[in-house]
A protein has these predicted regions:
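N-terminal signal peptide c-region/cleavage motif recognized by signal peptidases
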Residues: 12, 17-19
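Positively charged n-region of N-terminal signal peptides that target proteins for export
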Residues: 1-4
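Immediate post-signal-peptide N-terminus of mature secreted/exported proteins
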Residues: 22-54
Length: 126
Protein backbone atom coordinates (compact mmCIF):
# COMPACT_ATOMS: atom_id res chain seq x y z
CA UNK A 1 0.00 0.00 0.00
CA UNK A 2 2.75 2.43 0.97
CA UNK A 3 4.68 1.68 -2.24
CA UNK A 4 1.54 2.33 -4.26
CA UNK A 5 1.09 5.75 -2.66
CA UNK A 6 4.76 6.63 -3.21
CA UNK A 7 4.57 5.49 -6.84
CA UNK A 8 1.45 7.57 -7.43
CA UNK A 9 3.08 10.66 -5.91
CA UNK A 10 6.22 10.10 -7.98
CA UNK A 11 4.21 9.73 -11.17
CA UNK A 12 2.28 12.92 -10.42
CA UNK A 13 5.55 14.74 -9.79
CA UNK A 14 7.00 13.55 -13.10
CA UNK A 15 3.93 14.22 -15.21
CA UNK A 16 2.62 17.40 -13.61
CA UNK A 17 5.95 19.05 -12.87
CA UNK A 18 6.29 22.23 -14.96
CA UNK A 19 9.71 23.83 -14.77
CA UNK A 20 10.15 27.39 -15.99
CA UNK A 21 10.89 26.45 -19.61
CA UNK A 22 8.60 23.45 -19.78
CA UNK A 23 5.22 24.45 -21.12
CA UNK A 24 1.90 22.71 -21.51
CA UNK A 25 0.81 19.16 -20.98
CA UNK A 26 3.02 16.14 -20.27
CA UNK A 27 3.50 15.45 -24.00
CA UNK A 28 4.80 18.99 -24.48
CA UNK A 29 7.16 18.55 -21.54
CA UNK A 30 8.57 15.29 -22.87
CA UNK A 31 8.96 16.82 -26.33
CA UNK A 32 10.88 19.71 -24.79
CA UNK A 33 13.09 17.38 -22.78
CA UNK A 34 13.84 15.31 -25.89
CA UNK A 35 14.82 18.43 -27.79
CA UNK A 36 17.03 19.77 -25.03
CA UNK A 37 18.79 16.40 -24.66
CA UNK A 38 19.36 16.28 -28.42
CA UNK A 39 20.94 19.73 -28.36
CA UNK A 40 23.04 19.07 -25.24
CA UNK A 41 24.37 15.93 -26.86
CA UNK A 42 25.30 17.89 -30.01
CA UNK A 43 26.89 20.83 -28.19
CA UNK A 44 28.26 19.28 -24.99
CA UNK A 45 28.45 15.55 -25.68
CA UNK A 46 26.39 14.81 -22.57
CA UNK A 47 22.95 13.47 -21.73
CA UNK A 48 22.57 14.20 -18.01
CA UNK A 49 18.93 15.20 -18.36
CA UNK A 50 18.16 11.94 -20.15
CA UNK A 51 19.82 9.93 -17.38
CA UNK A 52 17.84 11.74 -14.68
CA UNK A 53 14.60 11.32 -16.63
CA UNK A 54 15.16 7.61 -17.29
CA UNK A 55 15.90 6.96 -13.61
CA UNK A 56 12.53 8.42 -12.68
CA UNK A 57 10.74 6.68 -15.54
CA UNK A 58 12.34 3.39 -14.45
CA UNK A 59 10.99 3.90 -10.96
CA UNK A 60 7.51 4.47 -12.37
CA UNK A 61 7.70 1.28 -14.47
CA UNK A 62 8.89 -0.68 -11.43
CA UNK A 63 6.45 0.81 -8.92
CA UNK A 64 3.41 1.22 -11.16
CA UNK A 65 3.54 -1.17 -14.10
CA UNK A 66 -0.06 -0.23 -14.93
CA UNK A 67 1.30 3.14 -16.08
CA UNK A 68 3.39 1.42 -18.74
CA UNK A 69 1.31 2.50 -21.73
CA UNK A 70 1.22 6.15 -20.64
CA UNK A 71 4.97 6.18 -20.10
CA UNK A 72 5.55 4.45 -23.45
CA UNK A 73 3.56 7.18 -25.22
CA UNK A 74 5.47 9.92 -23.43
CA UNK A 75 8.80 8.30 -24.24
CA UNK A 76 7.75 7.98 -27.88
CA UNK A 77 7.28 11.77 -28.20
CA UNK A 78 10.50 12.28 -26.23
CA UNK A 79 12.54 10.24 -28.72
CA UNK A 80 10.75 11.78 -31.69
CA UNK A 81 11.69 15.26 -30.47
CA UNK A 82 15.22 14.09 -29.66
CA UNK A 83 15.71 13.01 -33.28
CA UNK A 84 14.23 16.27 -34.62
CA UNK A 85 16.57 18.28 -32.38
CA UNK A 86 19.63 16.37 -33.53
CA UNK A 87 18.77 16.62 -37.23
CA UNK A 88 17.17 20.08 -37.46
CA UNK A 89 18.63 21.75 -34.33
CA UNK A 90 15.26 22.98 -33.02
CA UNK A 91 13.19 22.31 -29.91
CA UNK A 92 9.47 22.00 -29.27
CA UNK A 93 7.55 25.14 -28.28
CA UNK A 94 4.56 24.06 -26.20
CA UNK A 95 2.87 27.45 -26.48
CA UNK A 96 2.93 27.40 -30.28
CA UNK A 97 2.44 23.62 -30.49
CA UNK A 98 5.24 23.45 -33.06
CA UNK A 99 9.00 23.27 -33.31
CA UNK A 100 10.63 26.68 -33.13
CA UNK A 101 11.78 28.22 -36.38
CA UNK A 102 15.10 29.55 -35.04
CA UNK A 103 17.75 26.87 -35.20
CA UNK A 104 20.34 26.42 -32.48
CA UNK A 105 24.02 26.10 -33.14
CA UNK A 106 26.79 25.46 -30.68
CA UNK A 107 27.89 29.09 -30.40
CA UNK A 108 28.65 30.29 -26.88
CA UNK A 109 25.37 32.23 -26.76
CA UNK A 110 23.34 29.19 -27.79
CA UNK A 111 25.32 26.90 -25.49
CA UNK A 112 24.45 29.14 -22.54
CA UNK A 113 20.77 29.05 -23.49
CA UNK A 114 20.76 25.27 -23.99
CA UNK A 115 22.52 24.76 -20.65
CA UNK A 116 19.93 27.00 -18.98
CA UNK A 117 17.10 24.93 -20.49
CA UNK A 118 18.76 21.74 -19.28
CA UNK A 119 19.22 23.09 -15.75
CA UNK A 120 15.59 24.21 -15.53
CA UNK A 121 14.30 20.85 -16.73
CA UNK A 122 16.66 18.98 -14.37
CA UNK A 123 15.36 21.06 -11.47
CA UNK A 124 11.83 20.00 -12.40
CA UNK A 125 12.83 16.33 -12.14
CA UNK A 126 14.38 16.70 -8.68
Amino acid sequence: MRNSIIATLLLCTIIISKPLYSQGNPEDQYRQMGGVVGLTELCFGSKGLETALFQQVGNVFYSSPEMGRVMFELLYVYFESYEVAKSKKVIWNGTQQAYNTKTFDCSEENKNLIKSFEEQLMAGLQ
